Amino acid sequence: MNGSLEKLIVEKARAAFGAKTSIASLTALAGDASSRRYYRAVLAGPGTPPSVIVMELPDGSSLPLSSEELAVFKEPPKELPFLNLHRFLITIGVRVPQLYGQWEQEGILLLEDLGDIALWDRVQGLPESEILGWYRKAIDELLVLQLAGTLARDDSCIAFQQRFDFRLYMWEFDHFIEYGLIERPGVQVSMSATEELRKIFADIAHRLESQPPCLNHRDYHSWNLMVHNDAVAVIDFQDALLAPPQYDLASLLNDRVTDSIIRPDLEAQLLRYYLDRYNEGAKQPFNRDEFFDTYLLSAIQRDLKVVGRFYYLDIVKAKPGYKRFIPSTVRRLKRNLARLPQTEKLLPMLADHFEEMR
């Protein structure tokens, strides 16, 4: 951490909390798959919170903070997607970190410190009944986002200016083909095989695009949900968009190694819990069979995207840390592909390239 950054953070902390604010310590936090950087600043001074999280924007710039593939805005955003979504989520009652100050041109945001305990960390070692309780809390918060958020639709919120459509689904499928297969060291895949995969993927994309959309977080998983004061708080929401409601639910119950604790019986209970509460508040209730089919298609599509993404991070971005999650993701894909007649034909095609599917 350079001295000029420390000076800038001190300056902004004083602007937010008063001239007598000082920083007792400043610690870099482990990053995620993005180019954002985070620090925890322990504060001292009258009226200050004990600590804050400093978000440093990429290269200290005010460039839009969202996924690189999500460039589907009709016009360039006038503000950071994070700030735009933060304002909207606050109004509908989603628990997100408080924003203490924003200096976009200098690349600094000061946020409430929600601690270090993600939902995934909180449920480790717990009995199944308590795991069920925590994931129900996560579903309750998700339903606020999806139902209240969709009902309060505001076209100035950028999440309503973009949706998971055929183009975006196929972008993610092609990302898998490119980095999960073609560019992956030691893998050879024929042109005819990739063409056949794209036909099957296009059918899935059309099916998902035809589903009624609602507001989705887009990365609603156990590492983006923080446990704070016995409640679940939501972070990393800047890529929110319109998608089938099952997309975020599939993210919650199927990400990385989540199914090592969300076993089939627990998954079934949580699916029933979600569906019952969604149908209570939705204008268009779901038929259970249709709901489950779309849930599985969403889980399959997302896991294929994740495999491609994790190989991309390793091959292109030199971030190999996410590769450890690929085997468990592929094993889950094998199980889910076999649960639907329209996707089980993918199993032998992918088993040629992933030993976990054999």
Residues covered by each model-derived region:
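Juxta-kinase regulatory segment immediately upstream of eukaryotic protein kinase catalytic domains
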Residues: 1-22
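ATP-binding glycine-rich phosphate-binding loop
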Residues: 24-44
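Active-site acidic catalytic loop and adjacent metal/ATP-binding pocket
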Residues: 35-42, 53-54, 202-249, 260-261
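ATP-binding pocket architecture of kinase catalytic cores
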Residues: 42-165, 169-171, 175, 182
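Hydrophobic packing residues in well-ordered alpha-helices of helical domains and bundles
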Residues: 131, 135-138, 169, 194-197, ...
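Active-site catalytic-loop/activation-segment of kinase and kinase-like phosphoryl-transfer enzymes
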Residues: 160-204, 273, 334
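Active-site activation/catalytic loop segments of kinase-like enzymes and analogous catalytic loops
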Residues: 177-184, 245-284, 297-317, 329-337
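Helical subdomain adjoining the active site within ATP-dependent kinase catalytic cores
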Residues: 309-358
